[in-house]
Amino acid sequence: MVSVNKGEWDRSKGVEADYLFHQTWIAACNRKLRPGGTIWISGTYHSIYQCGYALQVEGMHVLNDIAWFKPNASPNLSCRMFTASHETLLWARTSKKDKHVFNYEAMKYGDFPKDIMKKPEKQMRSVWHIPLTKKSEKAFGRHPTQKPEALLERVVLASTNPGDLILDPFMGSGTTGVAALRHGRRFIGIEMDEAYLEGIARPRLQAELDLFRDIPATGQKPNTEAQLWHEIDGIMKAGK
């Protein structure tokens, strides 16, 4: 077991610079959200508290903090602290007064057979038992912080409706896009690392689109008009 070098983008530039970065991109996302639109942010203790504070400074209303429990998390290398076995997901809407989408019945009555925390026909709780990314989901290459499709599919199904537009400003390997396309949502992804964009995310999303072409007509046309790539002026660079 060795530590993972996640790249320059994952290195702290100091508390103040890190917070300014998070505040900047969260404010940029908030400007693009319609009233009642929501944002999901995932992270560990290294950054999630700064993000939570930035959401509140921006005037957004935090709906939930989700604990994603990883039953197969990697062991702690130093043996001097507890093994990190969860990440936090923050879910917030544009303001306290706005109405947001929450597909309550899909979460209560949906089928989540591998989540031992979810009891059949009971309300979905804020602790999610989801294993790390499957090997099959890394067929196009490895990304150091790739999230499992099951996690992003749950996020998409819980808080959006078919045809909604989802933006991921840190697309990485494209998992958010896969979840969006798979469930009939539109998608815009931004990724500053060309190796991940061209080597993993683009072919992975194209493969997901190709699946639609192999499905016989059922009277309900799948969403093949998803906007995969979008040029946005002034895309933020890490640390600016």
Give each language-model segment a name.
Residues R202-G239:
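S-adenosyl-L-methionine
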Residues M1-G199, K240:
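Core catalytic lobe of class I
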